[in-house]
Structures are given as structure tokens and as C-alpha cells.
Amino acid sequence: MIHQSAIIHPSSIIEEGAIIHDNVHIGPFCFIGAQVEIGARTLLKSHIVINGITQIGEDNQIYQFASLGEVNQDLKYAKESTRIEIGHYNQIRESVTIHRGTIQGKKVTKIGNSNLFMINVHIAHDCIIGDHCVMANNVTLGGHVRVDNHTIIGGMTAIHQFCIIGTHVMIGGCSGVVQDIPPFIIAQGNHATPFGLNIEGLKRRGFSRSSVHAIRDAYKILYRSSKTVESAKEALKALAAEHPIINEFVDFLIRSQRGIIR
């Protein structure tokens, strides 16, 4: 179904069954598969392939040579019915690739809202990306990576499969991430290590002075004491009773499976 207000260049191929909502603009030489749905006011520049079971929300901008929803690069994949879901207001720049999920994961690769993926970013199968994230040129995510809200990842950074990146994290360019990165932290290097807190980012996003001070205290517990992760977790729970924002640390440590960067 193609809405009558959609604008589609005659050189583009839209397979029967695709759903194109109102005021979508599809430029030249695009291919849209039969199981694709594209939300209102989304713009496809040119030379874009969207395939598989792919749902794209409203007001996204997708640039040339992007490939979305294609078969993943997991050798176990046997053409099972898996998908990708993309929210609203995302900018997906040139040559970005986002692959469909696997049955070993949750069958879905999921992108939130208001993200910027710069040139040549690769998001592998089963990744879950939150909202308001920025990934600079040539960032590569392995399978099953989770990136929480308001995270910034510098160019040429690679993140190992199954890693979790906490909210408001900033990762410097050319880093290699092989373990989980707790919330609010600046990390850099190969392998990535912590370099303090993303204080400037917290201020820009309106965190109160008391919350920032509490986050500093939590960082000292986790990284400036001799505590094990388990004993640090108990100390953080006590701090969270007075400052609920610290529950971000506690919940993250509970979720972590690969261990945290130290």
C-alpha cells in the first residue's frame, strides 16, 4: 500500500506488499522489499536498500547507500523470520548498515528515536539502541550490543558482541570496547578504560548539582576504592536510598554479564 501523498522516483523499486505512509519521499534508485513499512514524512535520499521485515517510524532521514534489514552476518542464521524496528526522527547517514535479528537473540534489531548514525556505521544483529545516541563515522557494533540513551561513541570505535553501554556514556574515538561501560562515564582506549565522568554532558542535559555530586560519589565507590564489584554494589544501593539517580549504577551492575571496564 502506497499512500497517495508519497513521492517516489520512477527509478525506485517498491515491491508489492510494502507499506509507504503519507508524505514519504523516496529518491532515485532505491529498493524497498515487500515486508517493509515506512512511516510518515520519512525521507530516503537515493540508492538505498531496505529489505526483510523492517518497520521504520516517522520523520526519519536516510541517506544514500544505506542498507537496512538485510540478512545478518551470523553463520547460524537459517532464514528464520526476524526483523528490525526503527523509531522516529533518526538520521541514518551514508553507507550505514543495520542487520536483522536472530532467533538466538530476541529476533529483532531495535533502534529508538532521535539518533544520529554517521557515515559507515555498522549495527549488527540483535543490537538494541536507545534514544538520542550519536555514533560517529565507522563505529562498529557486534551482535547483541545494547546502547542506552544519550550515549556518544567516537569514530572508528568497535564494540564487542554482548557488551552493554550505559546511559550518558561518552566513548572516545578509535577505542576497542570488550566489557560493559557503566552509566555517566567517559571511556577511551584499546581496550577502553574509564577516564572519569561525563560531567559536561550531564550539565547540558539538566542534571541538578546534587545529582552530579551523588554521581561523583558513586564513581569514587566504583573506581577509587578497593571494593570488589559486589561490595561496591551494596555501597551504591545505600547511596541510592538518598539519591535515586544512583539506581542507574545499581541496575546496570545487575544487568552486566561481561563485567565492567576497570
UniProtKB/Swiss-Prot annotation:
It catalyses: a (3R)-hydroxyacyl-[ACP] + UDP-N-acetyl-alpha-D-glucosamine = a UDP-3-O-[(3R)-3-hydroxyacyl]-N-acetyl-alpha-D-glucosamine + holo-[ACP]. The keyword Protein biosynthesis does not apply. Pathway: Glycolipid biosynthesis; lipid IV(A) biosynthesis; lipid IV(A) from (3R)-3-hydroxytetradecanoyl-[acyl-carrier-protein] and UDP-N-acetyl-alpha-D-glucosamine: step 1/6. One of its GO terms (molecular function) is acyl-[acyl-carrier-protein]-UDP-N-acetylglucosamine O-acyltransferase activity. Coiled coil: none annotated. Its EC number is 2.3.1.129. Its main location: cytoplasm. It is found in: Cytoplasm. Keywords: Acyltransferase, Cytoplasm, Lipid A biosynthesis, Lipid biosynthesis, Lipid metabolism, Repeat, Transferase. One of its GO terms (cellular component) is cytoplasm. It comes from the Bacteria. GO terms for biological process: lipid A biosynthetic process. It holds the Pfam family Hexapep. Belongs to the transferase hexapeptide repeat family. LpxA subfamily. Involved in the biosynthesis of lipid A, a phosphorylated glycolipid that anchors the lipopolysaccharide to the outer membrane of the cell. Homotrimer. This is Acyl-[acyl-carrier-protein]--UDP-N-acetylglucosamine O-acyltransferase.
